[in-house]
Regions:
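Conserved glycine-rich
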Residues: 243-245
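Short conserved segment of the HATPase_c
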Residues: 202-215
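Conserved DHp (HisKA) dimerization/phosphotransfer helix of two-component histidine kinases, i.e.
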Residues: 48-138
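Conserved catalytic submotifs in the C-terminal HATPase_c
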Residues: 142-151
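Short beta-strand/loop element within the Bergerat-fold HATPase_c
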Residues: 177-189
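Short helix-loop "hinge" at the ATP-lid/N-box region of the Bergerat-fold HATPase_c
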Residues: 169-171
Length: 268
């Protein structure tokens, strides 16, 4: 082998090595970002739970040794309404924490295990919306869930996580003193679950973008309501895992308007 040919092989080898190193760095950075995001979300939710507990029962009360149990019972008994609200808030954050673990596990497995079975669509909605009642009540939202007796063939865990993210978004973006209408239709082999509400306006050219990873809406960012841009991305992925699809319709019936200086519209 001549020196010239050897040099070419050497250059090609070095190029491949550099490309591999660059690829590995990108993979490492992506995995680090996912882990950091997961850790941040779990830490935030855990902090929310502790905050709600300490608002009801102060840390000083928890330092009373053997008497702490009796004292906690007294506080709950004398503040039953507040205790009930605390329970709902803890339940919501615990559900969101479970959803975070489920999503992290599913998205990091090459072939996630999905347990498909028939589940009553109406019951799944009721079970999943329960932890969010309080926030809807605080915003004076009238929740109208139509009756429906059909079942959906789906993986319960991923569908529950999907609905969790939908309701979490709804509590953030729905306009006060309005209605959340959830109804069902049957279409060939599909069951359609439709969420209709007056929500923060989404511009026409954003409709497809809201399903992209790390994308937050223009007005969501402007009004400081944006999350981490994962909610609808996760929803779309999990719906597709269940052989379904999701669509977003904005400005239904030409209902765009302003409330408290914020732009809203009816969406489905």
């Amino acid at each position: 082998m001549t020196a010239k040919i050897f040099k070419r092989y050497q250059e090609a080898f070095l190029f491949c090595v550099c490309a591999c190193i660059d690829l590995l760095e990108k993979i490492r950075e992506k995995e680090y970002q996912k882990t950091r995001r997961f850790k941040h979300n779990i830490t935030t939710l855990a902090a929310n739970i502790l905050q709600e507990i300490y608002k009801l029962v102060s840390q000083d009360e928890l330092l009373k040794g053997p008497k702490q149990l009796e004292r906690i019972k007294e506080i709950i008994h004398s503040n039953s309404d507040e205790a009930g609200l605390t329970f709902l808030k803890i339940l919501k954050n615990a559900n969101l924490m479970k959803a975070e673990f489920d999503v992290y596990e599913i998205f990091n497995l090459d072939s996630p295990y999905l347990d498909f079975a028939n589940h009553p669509a109406h019951k799944i909605i009721l079970l999943t919306i329960n932890p969010f009642w309080l926030e809807f009540i605080e915003k004076k939202i009238y929740i109208n869930i139509d009756s429906f007796s059909d079942t959906i063939y789906a993986d319960y865990k991923t569908i529950s996580v999907t609905l969790c993210h939908i309701f979490e978004n709804a509590t953030k973006y729905i306009a006060k003193n309005t209605e959340l209408h959830i109804y069902f239709t049957s279409d060939d082999n599909y069951i359609n679950i439709i969420f209709e509400m007056v929500s923060l306006k989404v511009y026409e050219d954003e409709i497809q973008k809201i399903f992209l990873e790390n994308y937050s809406g223009i007005l969501a960012k402007e009004y400081d309501l944006a999350g981490n841009g994962l909610g609808m991305y996760i929803v779309k992925k999990l719906v597709e895992f269940n052989n379904g699809k999701i669509t977003f319709l904005n400005n239904c019936n030409g209902t765009a308007f302003k409330y408290d200086g914020i732009e809203y519209e009816k969406i489905k």
